[in-house]
Amino acid sequence: MRDKIKNKEYFESIITQKKENISFYLNALKNNRVAIDRKYVVLNSMAGDCLTSLIAKYSAGYPIEDLYTDYYDALEYMHQSWMVLDNRAYLKDTKYNHYFGSDYDLMLWMLSLGYLLDVEKQKYMLLLEILDRFSVKDLLYETIIKAKISERLPITEESYKMIMDMPWAYESLRHAVKETDDEYGKERSSALIEQFLNKEFYQRHKGFSFYDHHHKSNNNIYYGYWSFESAAIADILFVDISPFENNKYFPKDMYFYKK
């Protein structure tokens, strides 16, 4: 067990539930029981179920090797749905070239997990196709992508507008990637990642995404609180992780997996 909030039985029930959901949806799609205008919404739900299953397995203590199938399935369903659905943030009639809330987190986790698991480059490129199709340019996204896809051209500016707590929820982590690439910059980056984990990762998600899910377990929506983006950024920046290695949100086993 890696999670300290719920027990193994709880997570196994989540994993079983998600497996049954995906099987049901696949059967419905195969037998044309999903309306055309609902197909991509269903695929989007399947992507979320696969990612939830992956994180629940990590929380339950599964070997990292057992997470790849869920990742690749989530990636495929996400690509099929997000290339059609427009999940960008909007207010009234205005669309913004960035994501908000759960959609922002989902993309960030998929990018981070793909880096940490060192998934196939060709498969990872599917995430870039989504971002580029909708002109989404984000500092954290691109920092992780560049570490995985070296030929990726750097962005000159980000595409978002400061609305709906993005990128405020990731403020210290964003500052960490802007530090200078020297001994002192790495020390500051390490301190900023520690601050993010201690004071921002969970607290600044209040009101949206995964916040407080462990108190809503009757709905089986809690799957663990893990900052995969912190592990990816810490590895990319080559910082000392000892100050936050045992933080409850830091996925230590995932960080060390490919070391």
Residue ranges and their predicted role:
Residues D182-K259:
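Alpha-helical oligomerization segments
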Residues R2-D212, Y222:
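Eukaryote-skewed repeat-based solenoidal scaffolds used as protein-protein interaction platforms
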